[in-house]
Each structure stands twice: as structure tokens, then as C-alpha cells.
């Protein structure tokens, strides 16, 4: 079952140097089903962004996120909740960002 294998890496995501914010400011959702949506929320329930993962090869895959919200703002330190969903199933988990 794909729901047991979805992960966010790195988790927690920690920015340790100023140059990382420019060049490497992203996390990866791995082991995704080929067609899914990733909804990201703050712990307070505010919608941060929705990512659409589409891999027409049918393989499990990876989707990167640059840590920028749907309002084009950098996200802040905190705990975030994500929901990966397909037409048939979903998984909910969390990840941390430390700046």
C-alpha cells in the first residue's frame, strides 16, 4: 500500500547557512503514487499550497517543493501537515521546518 511509504525528506528541514536559502531551499515528497495531489497546511489549518504530482509512466515518484506558499511567500519555521490523496485513498502526516 503506497500510503505506508510516502515520506518527506529531509524531515526536519533545517536551514543552517544563509546560502542554503538561495540554492537548496526545498524538500521532497518521495514514494508518491503516479497521480496525486499534495495539500499542505499549517498546524492551525491554514492552506499553504497544493502540489499536483503527475507521472504518466505509472511509477512511484518524487515531487519537490521550494517552500514558497501559494501567495508567493517563504514559509516560516513550524510544523506543517500534509495530505497526499488519490482518487481512491489518502495519507496524512507532518513535517517540520527549522530556520
Predicted regions and their residues:
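Glycine-centered tight-turn motifs at strand-turn-strand junctions
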Residues: 47-75, 86-89
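Residue-level detector of conserved, well-ordered beta-strand and adjacent loop positions
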Residues: 9, 30, 52, 66-68, ...
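Terminal processing/anchoring signals of secreted or surface-associated proteins
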Residues: 8-11, 45, 65, 80, ...
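Glycine-centered coil/turn sites that cap beta-strands in beta-rich domains
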Residues: 1-39, 65
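Short, conserved beta-strand segments of beta-strand-rich sandwich/propeller modules, principally
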Residues: 26, 76-81
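Residue-level signal for short segments within beta-strands and strand-turn junctions
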Residues: 10, 40-44, 69, 86, ...
Amino acid at each position: 500500500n503506497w500510503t505506508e511509504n510516502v515520506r518527506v525528506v529531509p524531515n526536519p528541514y533545517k536551514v543552517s547557512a544563509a546560502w542554503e536559502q538561495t540554492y537548496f531551499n526545498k524538500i521532497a515528497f518521495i514514494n508518491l503514487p503516479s497521480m496525486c495531489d499534495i495539500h499542505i497546511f499549517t498546524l492551525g489549518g491554514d492552506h499553504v499550497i497544493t502540489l499536483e504530482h503527475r507521472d504518466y509512466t505509472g511509477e512511484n515518484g518524487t515531487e519537490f517543493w521550494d517552500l514558497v506558499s501559494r501567495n508567493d511567500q517563504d514559509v516560516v519555521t513550524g510544523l506543517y501537515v500534509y495530505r497526499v490523496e488519490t482518487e481512491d485513498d489518502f495519507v496524512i502526516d507532518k513535517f517540520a521546518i527549522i530556520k
